[in-house]
Amino acid sequence: VEPGVTFGELRPALAKEGLAPLMPLLPPRGKSVLTAFHERTPITAPRFHWEPQDPLQCVEVVYGTGDIMRTGSAAIPSSLEAQWQLGKAQVRGTGPSQVDFTRLLQGAQGTMGIVTWGSITCRPLPKRSKLFLVSCDNPTPLVELAYAITFKKLGEDLLLLNRASLAAMLGTTAQEIDELRIKLPPWILVLGIDAAGVLPEEKIAYQEAECTELAQALGLALRAAAAGIGAQRIEAMLSGPTPETDWKLRRRGAGASIFFLTTLDKACGFIDTFRAIAADRLDPFGDIGVYVQPTVQGANCHVQFDIGYSPASRCETQDATWMVEEGAALLA
């Protein structure tokens, strides 16, 4: 993948090869694939996430000295085209030797070099897919279900949202978002099961049965809709980038975010802490979007709080700034 290629451009190109990209949650329409994965933006399918670097593997980087370096499997003295002619595939990120130079470039705070291309892990294009919604009044049972699902390596897409986040993703106007926030349950776990290869129907059937059993043990249920919102609508939404305005900006016009990595068992505690911070300001916690994304096979997770505000309101801007600064200090 070269710089500037977006997810909207990558998806149809991969589909012709029987593949699909590992998607972050609703990336902006103009977001570069390479930029997203250099920033370690989490993907929504933790089963394909084996280490924090994934799905980025090899890169070619030009350093400030003019030196060109290729990392991982590509670290041999020949061009990319010459490697393809030899049957080489750029599938391993570590290298040369045992040093992971790709990881040095990820999350860099400043310019270390210019990346001219990168190789990424993809997933087989599903022949069948089915998405389920699991709702609850509090996130704790849903976190326990996410643990159980990732432990058994079931499903593909798996993420936890509160109603403020899901409404912002589904709605296109402030009025529609507000109406959805009233209708939707407080917390929703999104579970997608895909099937590629042979016997796709059977694969979906046995995974659905196992996930249903896990949910019932926690007093939960897998459903095809939540508050009249069909799972197919959410599945279509998750399959690509944000069509127009970034979903975090739709309701108020501007937004600020706090995000960090932790483990799933601590996620609910951080949510409670941020709820207490929000109670000290005018903005109620219900107006704050929460997104919990299991990563690295469920070994840890990405937790994100999204605070919307009107850029025309000095008071709202100050409140959002205060909540980000105070929240970052208390959650650190």
Which role does the model predict for each range below?
Residues 120, 130-327, 332:
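C-terminal substrate-recognition/cap domain of FAD-linked oxidoreductases
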